[in-house]
Amino acid sequence: MTTNGFDINDLKRRMDGAKESLRYELGGLRTGRAAISMLEPVQVEAYGSHMPLNQVATVSVPEPRLLSVQVWDKSMVKAVETAIVNSNLGLNPATEGQVIRLRIPELNEERRKELVKVAHKYAEAARVAVRHVRRDGLDIVKKDKMSEDEQERASGEIQKVTDAAIADIDKLLATKEKEILTV
């Protein structure tokens, strides 16, 4: 629905951006099981710039508690190893030629609870972002030259989209929380 300056699809797109950002952040949280997404935030100093790990190596999960990083260029092995160590993921690389193996240690109960708190913090940041988008939409509706009925309808539609986005965020959080707490 587009009326003057108000576009519900633009608001949906911006809210989807907040959800995608949350999905990315949660993907970087370690759960005790190996997942390729754990290494997504790792940036490697390569060829004079910072590059995502997946642009200089192939990451695979040969075992449930093991990540394997196959570096394409032999000269980049040390840089990839350094990037993994500096990523604060708590992983210790074991290098064999061009293959770097990362054993995923068991998470203790205290660490699991810390990770759940971090996940909640990420989810709250996403909810705040969605609420900001809602506020922006409501501001546009108020400033638009709409009848009172149109303003009510637009405000209701904005609230529906907001509620759906927050429900999606809560679902993502619940899934990640269950994943973290499963021993």
From Swiss-Prot:
CDD domains: RRF
InterPro entries per the UniProt record, alphabetical: Ribosome_recyc_fac, Ribosome_recyc_fac_dom, RRF_sf
Subcellular location, principal: cytoplasm
Keyword line: Cytoplasm, Protein biosynthesis
A GO molecular function held by the record: ribosomal large subunit binding
SUPFAM superfamilies linked to this entry: Ribosome recycling factor, RRF
Keyword Protein biosynthesis in annotation: yes
Cytoplasm found in the keyword field: yes
Subcellular location: Cytoplasm
GO biological process, one term: cytoplasmic translational termination
One GO term describing the cellular component: cytosol
Pfam families in the cross-refs: RRF
Family (UniProt): Belongs to the RRF family.
Role this protein plays: Responsible for the release of ribosomes from messenger RNA at the termination of protein biosynthesis. May increase the efficiency of translation by recycling ribosomes from one round of translation to another.
Protein name according to UniProt: Ribosome-recycling factor
Organism of derivation: Afipia carboxidovorans (strain ATCC 49405 / DSM 1227 / KCTC 32145 / OM5)
Taxonomic lineage from the root: Bacteria, Pseudomonadati, Pseudomonadota, Alphaproteobacteria, Hyphomicrobiales
